[in-house]
Amino acid sequence: MTDFFQSLGMSYEWAWGLATVAGILLIALPLMLAVAMIIYADRKIWAAIALRRGPNVVGPFGLLQSFADGLKVFLQETIIPSGANRGLFLIAPIITFTVALLAWAVIPFNSGAVLADINVGLLYILAISSLGVYGVILSGWASNSKYPFFSALRASAQMISYEVSIGFILIGVVLFADSFNMNEIVKAQQGHGLGIVNAFGFNLLLFPLAVMFLISSLAETARAPFDLTEAESELVAGYQTEYSSMSFALFWLGEYANVLLMCTLNAVLFWGGWLPPIDWAPLYAVPGIIWLFAKILFFFFVFSWVKATVPRYRYDQLMRLGWKIFLPISLIWIFLISGYLMLTRYS
């Protein structure tokens, strides 16, 4: 894209700047549209499981319901509690929303179709995702209310706990791919499973890590059955209790952008990303972005299905799963994978 702007007679600095802005908009704007659509899909899936119709009034089949809800919150008054820390109260949802967008910079949508094709892409995602907890902590502290405060404490402990397990799980992927680059990780999966399947998930050593990563993704995004931060019977609406209008909407958008990101990471890191499921020449005629979107939609359906059907964990069960089950297993698996690669690849 920089070359295109340079061909119009611009200097390299101006061309690079405009190309960067255009790339950001090409990701951010479709992402916002995608978030609106998956909120609609989420509600439709819950309704179908509960034998209801779901959104069906605004637009054909209720497709415009999310946009109507967005317009509603945009027109509402932003109410700030009298005892709240005004500056921190307003900046917390902005942090959550911004961090949710930043991680998409290194996601490959097709071969070479990535905003920032950096060598440490996976490390960048881990670093950026760890910043999301700051928005949650600030919202709980700045609200000056007990329910958001307790929710923020839960959320910070939960996110930090599962980020440790996620880090060790992803080391296994890096060992097999021999790279932190997201494009290279996808390419390393070509024909990996049984010689014909384009996925790390069909590797017997990596399949348990894929399952643990999927469950950890639910915990990292505070989705059911790990939605302890927003347990209605205990904490009202959690750290979002005192928020209204666009501040509340930014939290909502950030949450669903993170859910979409985790679905994408499941597809990219373990199930071939933009590669077709089978390493068969005719399947490569389908654009890679179509395969990636199909996998993302599958994982989003799993997320919604679990949320609608699985009962909520107790807080002690949540912590036990992260620290006493996932962390030891992921550590042991790193040693197993390292030994296997030493004997097969590097011997």
UniProtKB/Swiss-Prot annotation:
Species whose genome carries this gene: Sphingopyxis alaskensis (strain DSM 13593 / LMG 18877 / RB2256) (Sphingomonas alaskensis)
Catalytic activity: a quinone + NADH + 5 H(+)(in) = a quinol + NAD(+) + 4 H(+)(out)
Function: NDH-1 shuttles electrons from NADH, via FMN and iron-sulfur (Fe-S) centers, to quinones in the respiratory chain. The immediate electron acceptor for the enzyme in this species is believed to be ubiquinone. Couples the redox reaction to proton translocation (for every two electrons transferred, four hydrogen ions are translocated across the cytoplasmic membrane), and thus conserves the redox energy in a proton gradient. This subunit may bind ubiquinone.
Upper classification of the organism: Bacteria, Pseudomonadati, Pseudomonadota, Alphaproteobacteria, Sphingomonadales
BP terms from Gene Ontology: aerobic respiration
Quaternary structure, from the entry: NDH-1 is composed of 14 different subunits. Subunits NuoA, H, J, K, L, M, N constitute the membrane sector of the complex.
Protein name: NADH-quinone oxidoreductase subunit H
Lineage: superkingdom: Bacteria
PANTHER family: NADH DEHYDROGENASE SUBUNIT 1, NADH-UBIQUINONE OXIDOREDUCTASE CHAIN 1
A single cellular component GO annotation: plasma membrane
